[in-house]
Amino acid sequence: MDHAEENEIPAETQKYLVERPIFSHPVLQERLHVKDKVTDSIGDKLKQAFTCTPKKVRNIIYMFLPITKWLPAYKFKEYVLGDLVSGISTGVLQLPQGLAFAMLAAVPPVFGLYSSFYPVIMYCFFGTSRHISIGPFAVISLMIGGVAVRLVPDDIVIPGGVNATNGTEARDALRVKVAMSVTLLSGIIQFCLGVCRFGFVAIYLTEPLVRGFTTAAAVHVFTSMLKYLFGVKTKRYSGIFSVVYSTVAVLQNVKNLNVCSLGVGLMVFGLLLGGKEFNERFKEKLPAPIPLEFFAVVMGTGISAGFNLHESYSVDVVGTLPLGLLPPANPDTSLFHLVYVDAIAIAIVGFSVTISMAKTLANKHGYQVDGNQELIALGICNSIGSLFQTFSISCSLSRSLVQEGTGGKTQLAGCLASLMILLVILATGFLFESLPQAVLSAIVIVNLKGMFMQFSDLPFFWRTSKIELTIWLTTFVSSLFLGLDYGLITAVIIALLTVIYRTQSPSYTVLGQLPDTDVYIDIDAYEEVKEIPGIKIFQINAPIYYANSDLYSSALKRKTGVNPAIIMGARRKAMRKYAKEVGNANIANATVVKVDAEVDGENATKPEEEDDEVKFPPIVIKTTFPEELQRFLPQGENIHTVILDFTQVNFMDSVGVKTLAGIVKEYGDVGIYVYLAGCSAQVVNDLTSNRFFENPALKELLFHSIHDAVLGSQVREAMAEQETTVLPPQEDMEPNATPTTPEA
């Protein structure tokens, strides 16, 4: 036996013994002394807010310009090699993705290069993540393309009698203007949200929602790329059912497919799939992943130029890539009223994708990212970038994994990648003018593999949470058929409705005691758990507020089987039977107390003559009900206390407090005490502010724990038994007397 086993304490001897008073709320408060809270005056707060100290200035600079904090602490010898390798690896991937995602955005390819340069440089200064790769992203590019195609469709008539070539250029110029306007507006939205500290909005985009949305976006991207892969000419669609129209259009024109274009695309597709599998299998042995996309671009460009595929076989190619950077231009703000819905969706989706990947990599490497500053950084990248003809950017998942996986330590790796793009823009762009669009299509489709793998979420959510499965499926279906903008809005609404549903339909549990312990567990779950005679313990795992207060009251009566209306009805029957037996017509016609209560959500007040079948187990209440009438009551368990477990209730509103007050009175009218156990400070404050404790004696109903409430109930009943034994019976007790409401 090893040392650990020799010193191991048998489980049956691991016990704890506690001896203390029964803590009702007043008793516990007598033992506690509230700390004096020293609050600053308004003048002191204003003075502190407007006082300028070197430390405060430094912290503001660090917050708004994170580069001023991490760059001076840059460990050159440790970081430079990793950043160098990572920057080159990310740059060679960013080039083909920039060209390909420009096709998704419905703008000329060179604008994808601009979007891969300017925002990356700006994010290096303002971003808080050290590892994510900022630039064009398939989902955001597709959303931009949807707006551009909606406002500037393929069949738009350009005034001026231009020829086909010039007409295409004019159409593309209009689409660039639309993309710039959407980008500027989405950037302004992100910046304003960040300044107003609205970074928390990302929490409303739950993981099932984001994954369902990106999966639907992957289907949209896939269908958009098919026409380039097959080399067919089809109209580009946007809006509701656009994915269906795009697929049908490709299938209708498949007889006109370009075999050469398809062959080149499939060759690159196979090369990338096999190469990525090789990279994944040998990633531990490779110093860096093989830049397959870059090799595909070089190979595709070489084959296209060598065999003159564009002229000889009508293969569509990238076309002219003008050298040099364009001068700044003002986006057309007059389009804002046409694109604001899309801009909001793009701003939120772009931020959500960025912050989720940033947090994932930050947790892996042990540092913090600031959601509000990320919003500001993205807002600056998009709003200022739009002046230089960029379209909306976000975090690219595939590039971020490459940048982190190849040893990147800081955003200097991203800067190096953007400098490689700058080299292409200024000097070598013309080399890629012969690149077939089918190659870019294959690159995009292969990079969708990770998103399509998210279909494996379905069996996981089926096993773990049907509600999250519903969110995933509804998000996917709505985004697939309604379009990404309205699909996202629909998905957020559905996600919020599930939050309401969870609180409106919580789980209700009747608890029992594990014998000889202070442990109380679901009585239906374990055989060892037993109910305490005379006591019902009822638990809810949600707040009690206007949406579920009536359901809570009904569930309490249904699950515990203790319904005041049924109890009162049983007493009426007992009095009628007693009156019939003794022939006392005065008793039979005596006035009884009418009780308004709910049975299964309906008004349970009934006339005396009604004799409906009792739906709940017969229960006799231990009260001052006349002893000579007890034999007429149905046999059942004597219930004297109902304990409401509030340990999982985090707040109550005024409607919930009124419902609780009604429950206390309703049960009190039939002689049953209602105790509240485990109330948090917030719940006590809610009860106090809603005047639940107008009668101070009601505070005696509050107990620190379930066990305190159980012991308090048992002590109260024991004392009542002693009083009954000592005191003579009351001779003048009226048969139809109603027991008074129990007092704490």
Curated annotation (Swiss-Prot):
Stated consequence of mutating residue 235 to Q: Shifts the voltage-sensitivity to more negative values
Outcome of substituting residue 197 to Q: Shifts the voltage-sensitivity to more negative values
Effect of mutating residue 104 to C: Is accessible from the extracellular side after extracellular application of thiol-reactive reagents
Outcome, altering residue 408 to C: Is only accessible to the intracellular side application of thiol-reactive reagents. Is not affected by thiol-reactive reagents extracellular side application
Reaction equation(s) it catalyzes: 2 hydrogencarbonate(in) + chloride(out) = 2 hydrogencarbonate(out) + chloride(in)
Domain STAS: 525-713
Annotated segments matching region Disordered: 720-744
Annotated phenotype, changing residue 572 to Q: Shifts the voltage-sensitivity to slightly more positive values
Consequence recorded when altering residue 154 to N: Shifts the voltage-sensitivity to more negative values
Notes on activation and inhibition: Salicylate, an inhibitor of outer hair cell motility, acts as a competitive antagonist at the prestin anion-binding site.
GO cellular component, one term: lateral wall of outer hair cell
Site (Controls the electromotile activity): 398
Site positions per UniProt: Contributes to anion binding: 399
Protein's cellular compartments: Lateral cell membrane
Tissue expression notes: Specifically expressed in outer hair cells of cochleae (at protein level). Not detected in other cells of the organ of Corti.
Main location: membrane
Result for mutant: residue 399 to K: Does not affect anion-dependent electromotility-related charge movement
Domain of life: Eukaryota
Entry function: Voltage-sensitive motor protein that drives outer hair cell (OHC) electromotility (eM) and participates in sound amplification in the hearing organ. Converts changes in the transmembrane electric potential into mechanical displacements resulting in the coupling of its expansion to movement of a charged voltage sensor across the lipid membrane. The nature of the voltage sensor is not completely clear, and two models compete.
Entry similarity comment: Belongs to the SLC26A/SulP transporter (TC 2.A.53) family.
Name of this chain's protein: Prestin
Taxonomic lineage of the native organism: Eukaryota, Metazoa, Chordata, Craniata, Vertebrata
